[in-house]
Curated annotation (Swiss-Prot):
This is Fanconi anemia group F protein. Changing V341A: Strongly reduced monoubiquitination of FANCD2. Gene3D superfamilies: 1.25.40.490. InterPro entries: FANCF, FANCF_C_sf.
Length: 374
């Protein structure tokens, strides 16, 4: 066991070196040995994944014991922070070497040959290194896109090609991290929330919630112990939003009314919480007699126009969402005194404004139909 832990120590140092200028001294033989070392650890991952004591010992070493004072510094090598990462440590090593300009030409050529050996016999039970490398590159691309492409404005976010790409990458990543541990997707989303531009991340989540379910890859169908429902990626997003009240409040405040209506129609679990937020926002407003409008006490309060637009959008949704919204408004109106006169209850005024808007819309549609028949 101690020999295995020492082997892990040495590989962690090797992985740290792979991003430095020290690789300029590597020749093809060094690259080959490094990859063999990485593949051995991948074999360890596959062999001892269900062996509790060995897995625990390796996890403990990865977290605490495999960085020596006076070496490359304390803390885990990025990308190799847990036992699950051993399953693709050859991919991590290859990607670091490919990105390191200090690697010599001969060593780089040998690395590329190892990654893309050409046609030949393939182990049917193993994913090829180039496929794993491509998958990891997609993950990095997803984070890069989420971080640096948040400033495009498009009124129809759900149709924006860039947003849809980011959403699909996010769902795919959630599907991958969910295989290792049930709680990992939530932690992954929380880390993205802390690291990425938050407004853009919220938009990507909304678009992801409108995407069709991801199809499962053939090898996933054969893997024991993995039970994926078709919409699990979107369900993870829904549960994460509902479990983080501040994030969900920001989600509802930052996104356009029409997009939120689409999302809450698709995912009914979100609609009661969204309606609760709208109710809270409405209760913060008071009627200004001089201006003749409902206004907020503080600058962050939602203005009347926005509140009206959000309720109006929800009332244009198909049942049962539309019915729930109207019932909620009628309930609030009754609890507030059931007034019919404007200016006394914001719920009365909202219902009057919504009915007036619906009446005008019917008038316009009727006029258009009449003109078309002339």
């Amino acid at each position: 066991m101690e020999s295995l832990l020492q082997h892990l120590d040495r590989f962690s140092e090797l992985l740290a070196v792979s991003s430095t200028t020290y690789v300029s001294t590597w020749d093809p033989a060094t690259v080959r040995r490094a990859l063999q070392w990485a593949r051995y650890l991948r074999h360890i991952h596959r062999r001892f994944g269900r062996h509790g004591p060995i897995r625990t010992a390796l996890e403990r070493r990865l977290h605490n014991q495999w960085r020596q004072e006076g070496g490359f510094g304390r803390g885990p090598v990025p990308g190799l922070a847990n036992f699950q990462a051993l399953g693709h440590c050859d991919v991590l090593l290859s990607l670091r070497l490919l990105e390191n300009r200090a690697l010599g030409d001969a060593a780089r050529y040998h690395l590329v040959q190892q990654l893309f050996p050409g046609p030949g016999v393939r182990d049917a039970d193993e994913e090829t290194l180039q496929e794993s490398l491509a998958r990891l590159a997609r993950r990095r691309s997803a984070v890069h896109m989420l971080r640096f492409n948040g400033y495009r404005e498009n009124p129809n976010l759900q149709e924006d090609s860039l947003m849809k790409t980011q959403a699909e990458l996010l769902l795919e990543r959630l599907q991958e991290v969910g295989k290792a541990e049930a709680e990992r997707p939530a932690r992954f989303l929380s880390s993205l929330w802390e690291r990425l531009p938050q407004n853009n991340f919220l938009k990507v989540i909304a678009v992801a919630l409108l995407q069709p379910p991801l199809s499962r890859r053939p090898q996933e169908e054969l893997e024991p112990g993995i039970h994926k429902s078709p919409g699990e990626g979107s369900q993870v997003l829904v549960h994460w939003l509902l479990g983080n009240s501040e994030v969900f409040a920001a989600f509802c405040r930052a996104l356009p009314a029409g997009l939120l209506t689409l999302v809450t129609s698709r995912h009914p679990a979100l609609s009661p919480v969204y309606l609760g937020l709208l109710t809270d926002w409405g209760q913060r407003l008071h009627y200004d007699l001089q201006k003749g409008i409902w206004v907020g006490t503080e600058s962050q309060d939602v203005p009347w126009e926005e509140l009206h637009n959000r309720f109006q959008s929800l009332c244009q949704a198909p049942p049962p969402l539309k019915d729930k919204v109207l019932t909620a408004l009628e309930t609030c109106k009754a609890q507030d005194g059931d007034f019919e006169v404007p200016g006394l209850s914001i719920w009365t005024d909202l219902l009057l404004a919504l009915r007036s808007g619906a009446f005008r819309k019917r008038q316009v549609l009727g006029l258009s139909a009449g003109l078309s028949s002339v």
